[in-house]
Amino acid sequence: MDQGGGASPVFSASAEIDGDHLRVLVTGEVDMATADVMFQTALREPAERVTLDLRAVTFFDSAAIHAVVRLAQHLPGALTVLPSRQVHRVLDISGLADQAWLRPA
C-alpha cells in the first residue's frame, strides 16, 4: 500500500573501511529478503570496529533484529549501531534498547 505517493524505499547496504574501522551504511527496508545481505556486508572486511549505520532505514522486521543480534554476537565489543527512529522503536519494543552496542536515535 503506497501511502506517500512515491516509490517504495530501495534497500542498499554498502561498506567502507578506514583503517581498523568498517562503516556499513544501510538504507531502505530491512526484512527477511534483505537482512542477510546487511549481515554479510558487515562481516565482509575484517575490522576491529564496525559501525552499522541504520539512520536511513525505513522498515525493520524480526529478520533484521535477528541479523543485528547475530552481528553483536560475532563482533562482541566491536559493534556500534546507529538507528533511525523507527529502528530504535522496534529494538526498544523487542527489549534491546539497553544493549551497549545501540546508540540513541
Residue ranges and their predicted role:
Residues 1-63, 67-105:
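STAS-like cytosolic regulatory interaction modules
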